[in-house]
Structures are given as C-alpha cells and as structure tokens.
Amino acid sequence: MTIAKLIDHTALKPDTSKAAIMQLLEEAKTHQFASVCVNPTWVSLAAKELAGTGVDVCTVIGFPLGANTTAVKAFETKDAIENGATEVDMVINIAALKDGEYDAVEQDIRAVVDAAKGKALVKVIIEACLLTDEEKVKACELSVKAGADFVKTSTGFSRGGATAEDIALMRKTVGPDIGVKASGGVRTKEDVEAMLAAGATRIGASAGVSIIKGDQSAPSKDY
C-alpha cells in the first residue's frame, strides 16, 4: 500500500474557498489519497467530484470543540451521509471526559456510531493535547466500547497535534483491530513514517502532496 492510501487529504480551515476545495479534490484524484477530509458544507461537492474515483469523502462532526449536544452530532452525521460522506471524524465531549462523566461520553460517541451504522466509518477525535495520559486511555476505551472504527489524536485546531508517544499509547489501548489516525502537525514523509512506526494506520494532513513527493519545504500549517 502506498503512503497516499494512508492519508486523508485535508482542508478544514474556515476560509477555505471553493477553488481551494476543487484543487484538493483534483489532487486527491491524481494521487489517490484514502479520502479528502472537508467541512460539511463541501461534502456534496466532494461526493459529486470524487464519484467512481476510489477516493472516500470524510467530514467532521461536532468540530472543532466537541461541545455540540449529542442530538446535534447525530443529526450532523445523518446529514453528512445523505450528502455523500463515507467517513466521519467526530470530536468527543472533552469537558465531560475530564469531569469523569464517562457514560455521557460513551453515549455521545455511540449516537454518532448508530447514525453512521453501515454507511460510514466513524473516527473519534480525542484531542490528546488537552488530556492526561489516563484520560487518553479512557477516551480510547470508551470509543472502542461505543463501536467506533478509529481513534484520532487531534483536530489540528487546539494547542497541539499528533505525537508518536500518543499514537503508541492509543494503539496499546485499542489493540490491533481499531484504526488509529494521527493528525495535526504531520507535514513530512518522516513525520508520517514516525507515526506509522508508532502504530498509526491513517494520517490526516493538509500537506499530503508535499509528503508523498518528499518535499521538505511543506507549508508550516495543520489544516
């Protein structure tokens, strides 16, 4: 499998233009990335442009704070799938996790999993930079219990991104059968290789083209 097939080619900044999205989609088709990850407003366009190309359409739910109500996250998921999304990256209720409200966190994840059941993969963003190691483990355990397909390090919009240490901890926690996605600050082929070595099975990056070309001058940005 090529590195490209492990990358979610990503554009999530709020000022991303239609022209930039069209460029992202063309790059995804050319390089055959695993998916494009775009904000919900672009899902319909992405699904139309990528139909039959083998590139999946990923979007984000409760993004980037995770502070939406569970009902809203479930609705967002259903709406995204109706518009053509085949993968959804949801943000957990971070405050509830830190307050020890584990049932609420699990129910929040499960609502998205249920809304996506059989129609889209669910990746759970734990926003690792805001959590203690114990909280990271708990977030991963709750994600597995709720039926998620992946756990994911970061939104790329908080104070830190993916680290090899977090990936290793997440992989150890979820075991071999759940995906682990590294996102936030992954900008070079060497970054990707370090994440894969630590246990990642998917990479979220806006610098996907630079990564696969081995360009060391990739722009210093996350999403």
From Swiss-Prot:
Q: List the disulfide bonds.
A: none
Which of UniProt's keywords are assigned here? Answer: Cytoplasm, Lyase, Schiff base
Q: Which domain of life is it from?
A: Bacteria
**A GO biological process held by the record:** deoxyribonucleotide catabolic process
Catalysed transformations (reactions): 2-deoxy-D-ribose 5-phosphate = D-glyceraldehyde 3-phosphate + acetaldehyde
UniProt xrefs under CDD domains: DeoC
**Active site positions:** 89, 152, 181
Broadest EC class assigned to this enzyme: lyase
Q: Which InterPro entries match?
A: Aldolase_TIM, DeoC, DeoC/FbaB/LacD_aldolase, DeoC_typeI
Subcellular compartments: Cytoplasm
PANTHER family of this UniProt entry? DEOXYRIBOSE-PHOSPHATE ALDOLASE
> What protein does this entry describe?
Deoxyribose-phosphate aldolase
Lineage, highest ranks first = Bacteria, Bacillati, Bacillota, Bacilli, Bacillales
